[in-house]
């Protein structure tokens, strides 16, 4: 039986990346870097809202794996996706969180991280 990843898993993954800070967005737990949004637990905690590169990337994720990634009219046209926590794998979750960090982190911080500093 698959165990659904939770916010604790999101925090553990995000702890790998420099500058990530816990915050609150719209009354729910969120993660930011340099004050910029990375992800947040949706009001309904079965989904995570995650920042992606652009709207085309969001659309590709939703079309490629509609059982995992979705949107609502509120998020349509925004560079992000909603992630169904009951079906996303930890590997997918880790990739999404790293990508969100890379989108928002400073280039020099990313370069230092990639260099193993």
Features from the language model and the residues they span:
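Charge-dense, helix-prone N-terminal extensions
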Residues: 1-117
């Amino acid at each position: 039986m698959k165990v659904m990843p939770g916010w604790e898993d999101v925090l553990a993954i995000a702890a790998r990346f420099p500058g990530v800070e816990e915050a609150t967005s719209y009354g729910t737990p969120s993660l930011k870097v340099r004050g910029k949004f990375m992800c947040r637990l949706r009001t309904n905690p079965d989904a995570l809202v995650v920042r992606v590169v652009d709207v085309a990337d969001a659309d590709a994720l939703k079309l490629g794996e509609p059982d995992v990634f979705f949107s609502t009219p509120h998020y349509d046209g925004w560079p992000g996706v909603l992630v169904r926590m009951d079906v996303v794998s930890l590997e997918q979750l880790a990739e999404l969180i790293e990508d969100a960090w890379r989108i928002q982190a400073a280039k020099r911080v990313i370069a230092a991280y990639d260099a193993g500093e």
